[in-house]
């Protein structure tokens, strides 16, 4: 599931980001599925996904154009929700015939508030302006 800056973009606030933050439920099957999805999307085959330790903020893979994929197994502010609950609420779109899940708006705001970094505060302000107009 895509979280962070890319999810912010999907909800209307276009900002540059140097990474794609994804949240997965850590299991052997999900690691295999992630590897298959990246390969299918033409991003590359990252064999080390099968065995690497996922440490939030530290586990990333360099993709094309120096873009990083940051893999997280927990999200600050969302500890009281299971991965399945968040997945059920996710916004889904297709990119190159591949379903891509984005953290739902409400939980994205919750996670941004919990992170409380300057860029997260700006994201919240801009998203709230955009969504008040709708």
Which residues are covered by each model-predicted region?
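Compositionally biased terminal segments of proteins
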Residues: 1-134
């Amino acid at each position: 599931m895509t979280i962070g800056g890319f999810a912010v973009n999907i909800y209307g606030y276009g900002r540059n980001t140097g990474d794609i933050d994804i949240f997965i439920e850590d299991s052997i099957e999900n690691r295999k599925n992630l590897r298959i999805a990246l390969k299918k999307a033409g991003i590359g085959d990252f064999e080390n996904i099968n065995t690497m330790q996922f440490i939030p903020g530290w586990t990333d893979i360099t993709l094309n154009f120096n873009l990083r994929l940051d893999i997280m197994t927990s999200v600050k502010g969302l500890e009281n929700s299971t991965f399945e609950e968040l997945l059920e609420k996710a916004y889904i779109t297709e990119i190159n015939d591949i379903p891509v899940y984005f953290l739902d708006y409400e939980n994205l705001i919750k996670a941004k508030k919990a992170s409380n970094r300057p860029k997260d505060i700006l994201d919240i302000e801009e998203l709230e302006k955009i969504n008040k107009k709708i």
